[in-house]
Amino acid sequence: MPRRRVIGQRKILPDPKFGSELLAKFVNILMVDGKKSTAESIVYSALETLAQRSGKSELEALEVALENVRPTVEVKSRRVGGSTYQVPVEVRPVRRNALAMRWIVEAARKRGDKSMALRLANELSDAAENKGTAVKKREDVHRMAEANKAFAHYRW
């Protein structure tokens, strides 16, 4: 670990269409091989489809979907005296968003729809309705934390 100073987190530029930092982060997570314009067109197309389905604005629809996928607790491995325990810890707000977006993108990539924009739109609408693979992932993480509640005193 460096001993000098802690490097601050980089500021992310808000996306050009909606001016949202959250959406810019979502585009960056979806981006593959530095193709940002492709990622932007996929996200904007998916949000447009989602907004038409839900009757809300694009950003509101995205926020609802993310809210249903954000984890509140997760487990971290902690080695104590030769055995490893899965210790439940609370998730920081920045990490909550990052995990939710990552899980939605992963779930969308695994879907079998035609285009990525359609897959993403379907996964986001499923997440908004509290169903789908990304929501299931959050439930699994919460269940794991609940099962290991007995080891919570090992928190650091």
Curated annotation (Swiss-Prot):
Pfam families: Ribosomal_S7. GO terms for biological process: translation. Keywords: Ribonucleoprotein, Ribosomal protein, RNA-binding, rRNA-binding, tRNA-binding. CDD domains: uS7_Bacteria. GO terms for molecular function: rRNA binding; structural constituent of ribosome; tRNA binding. GO terms for cellular component: small ribosomal subunit. It comes from the Bacteria. InterPro entries: Ribosomal_uS7 (IPR000235), Ribosomal_uS7_bac/org-type (IPR005717), Ribosomal_uS7_CS (IPR020606), Ribosomal_uS7_dom (IPR023798), Ribosomal_uS7_dom_sf (IPR036823). Part of the 30S ribosomal subunit. Contacts proteins S9 and S11. One of the primary rRNA binding proteins, it binds directly to 16S rRNA where it nucleates assembly of the head domain of the 30S subunit. Is located at the subunit interface close to the decoding center, probably blocks exit of the E-site tRNA. Belongs to the universal ribosomal protein uS7 family. This is Small ribosomal subunit protein uS7. It comes from Shigella dysenteriae serotype 1 (strain Sd197). The lineage of its organism: Bacteria, Pseudomonadati, Pseudomonadota, Gammaproteobacteria, Enterobacterales.
